[in-house]
């Protein structure tokens, strides 16, 4: 199985957990795209009555095109389940997210969810976080000073660019990717980053995920990370 087939596998498995009447957070990224496709099929074929809440403009556009009823996060009192991808998941089920530059909205939706599920192919399961760059969302104003503070701490920051243009988030902020390998104390790092003036949010998703579905060639593995 290639990587896309593994992603499709876990996406299809994840939608089995969505029940009639649920308010569901829809993540962002290549794996989630397969999940949203599968959810659209269930809505169409089973007349599944659910409401989706998106973590990005591109997921919202995909869901609407598939006929999935959508609301904004501020229009729902809670979310029953959020299904999202992850860039890295460590042995203790701490995660790094934000490769798709949607980490702020993803975290807002996740913390307002009763349950959080991450769907990944097996390459995303690691012993310790850090090989994947850690995304940090910062406001543009003063971002060079934030960058220099990060560099002084030894975080090896890099402004994220595509075609020599700064990547912009859906909130029009920018992303600084940190290269800290390994991340030995993610909780301490998270505290340090969130207290830097100009930092909006970081891509450490700690003590948050309940269920992880991992795509293997022999089928999806469902792991209960925490109650």
Curated annotation (Swiss-Prot):
What's a GO biological-process term for it?
Answer: pentose-phosphate shunt, non-oxidative branch
Which Enzyme Commission number(s) are on file for it?
A: 5.3.1.6
What would be an example GO MF term here? Answer: ribose-5-phosphate isomerase activity
S-S bridge residues: none
* InterPro entries registered for this protein in UniProt: NagB/RpiA_transferase-like, Ribose-5P_isomerase, Ribose5P_isomerase_typA_subgr, Ribose5P_isomerase_type_A
Sorted UniProt keywords: Isomerase
Metabolic or biological pathway, per its Swiss-Prot or TrEMBL entry: Carbohydrate degradation; pentose phosphate pathway; D-ribose 5-phosphate from D-ribulose 5-phosphate (non-oxidative stage): step 1/1
Signal sequence extent: none
Catalytic activity field:
aldehydo-D-ribose 5-phosphate = D-ribulose 5-phosphate
**One Pfam match:** Rib_5-P_isom_A
Question: Could you describe the subunit structure of this protein?
Answer: Homodimer.
Cited function: Catalyzes the reversible conversion of ribose-5-phosphate to ribulose 5-phosphate.
Q: Which HAMAP family match?
A: Rib_5P_isom_A
The family assignment reads:
Belongs to the ribose 5-phosphate isomerase family.
Protein name, UniProt field: Ribose-5-phosphate isomerase A
Say which species the protein is native to: Lactiplantibacillus plantarum (strain ATCC BAA-793 / NCIMB 8826 / WCFS1)
Q: What is the lineage of its organism?
A: Bacteria, Bacillati, Bacillota, Bacilli, Lactobacillales
The gene it comes from is rpiA
């Amino acid at each position: 199985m290639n990587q896309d087939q593994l992603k499709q596998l876990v996406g299809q498995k994840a939608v089995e957990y969505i029940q009639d009447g649920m308010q569901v957070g829809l993540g962002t990224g290549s794996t989630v795209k397969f999940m949203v496709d599968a959810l659209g099929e269930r809505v169409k074929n089973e007349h599944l009555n659910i409401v989706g809440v998106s973590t990005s403009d591109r997921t919202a556009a995909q869901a609407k095109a598939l006929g999935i009823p959508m609301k904004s996060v501020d229009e729902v009192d809670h979310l029953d389940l959020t299904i999202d991808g992850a860039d890295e998941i460590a042995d203790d089920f701490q995660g790094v997210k934000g490769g798709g530059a949607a980490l702020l909205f993803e975290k807002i939706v996740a913390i307002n969810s009763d349950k959080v599920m991450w769907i990944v192919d097996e390459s995303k399961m690691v012993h310790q976080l850090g090989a994947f760059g850690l995304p940090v969302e910062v406001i543009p104003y003063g971002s060079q000073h934030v960058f220099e503070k990060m560099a002084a701490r030894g975080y090896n920051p890099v402004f994220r660019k595509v075609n020599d243009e700064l990547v912009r988030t859906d909130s029009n902020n920018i992303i600084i990717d940190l290269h800290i390998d390994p991340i030995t104390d993610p909780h301490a790092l998270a505290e340090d980053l969130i207290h830097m003036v100009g930092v909006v949010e970081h891509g450490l998703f700690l003590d948050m995920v309940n269920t992880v579905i991992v795509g293997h060639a022999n089928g999806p593995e469902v792991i209960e990370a925490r109650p």
